[in-house]
Amino acid sequence: MKKKVIFGNWKMNGTNESLTDFLNQVDNKIDSSKIIAGLAVPYVMLQTGLKLAKNVKIAAQNVHYKDKGAYTGEISTTMLKEVGVEYVIIGHSERREMFNETDLDVNKKAKVLLENNITPIICCGETLQTKESGKTIEFVNNQINIMFEGIKKEDAIKAIIAYEPIWAIGTGKTATSSDAEEVCKQIRNNLSKIYDKNTAEQIIIQYGGSVKPSNIQEYLKMPNIDGALVGGASLLASDYLGLVNYNE
């Protein structure tokens, strides 16, 4: 049985001081034999987090697909690997909306991360307009097709997919657990076509979108939802513990 994989995403929040306080409150209250708990923090906090955390996987929130060069403000896989980062979020809807990132960009990032033995958390999800037009599955599967293009199955099983409907991120709106399960099920079916059933079963699929301690359990009991990617509800230590220890 796969361990559930629950990651918080602090986005552009926090300080080294607040992260230190946060980890002092949560790290020794997580049983890493039962769950994979993680936290994506701003770049300037990565080393603090990596130094202090024993049971929380510290992740970066983005990476560039080039290894070096004239890309002001960007960060490379080599730089993240040097400080010990093992997980990186790529393709978050905020990156897509604000910085015009595409599925092809995400595909390039996924490849370079996997080549360097870093786990990409690959985000996908539809807008409200796409949902209302009844094209969610078609849209999300097209994203998956592009983002996994050219990735071998032995690498694909190391990736994590985070299904985050854009209309549910930070809005307080949530997909019902059955709706989220249906999309995650179709993502897995699509992965079976790209690779094979065994490969598809091994790939972790998270749900994200206004997940909080009060509703996480109903999502994680679904057969095709292997974890959660959580934004605002991961900022407070008490809420974070309510998420990662949801089953206690």
Swiss-Prot record:
It catalyses: D-glyceraldehyde 3-phosphate = dihydroxyacetone phosphate. InterPro entries: Aldolase_TIM, TIM_sf, TrioseP_Isoase_bac/euk, Triosephosphate_isomerase, Triosephosphate_isomerase_AS. Pathway: Carbohydrate biosynthesis; gluconeogenesis; Carbohydrate degradation; glycolysis; D-glyceraldehyde 3-phosphate from glycerone phosphate: step 1/1. The active site is at residues 92, 164. It is an enzyme of class 5 (isomerase). Homodimer. PANTHER family: TRIOSEPHOSPHATE ISOMERASE. This is Triosephosphate isomerase. It comes from Mycoplasma mycoides subsp. mycoides SC (strain CCUG 32753 / NCTC 10114 / PG1). The lineage of its organism: Bacteria, Bacillati, Mycoplasmatota, Mollicutes, Mycoplasmataceae.
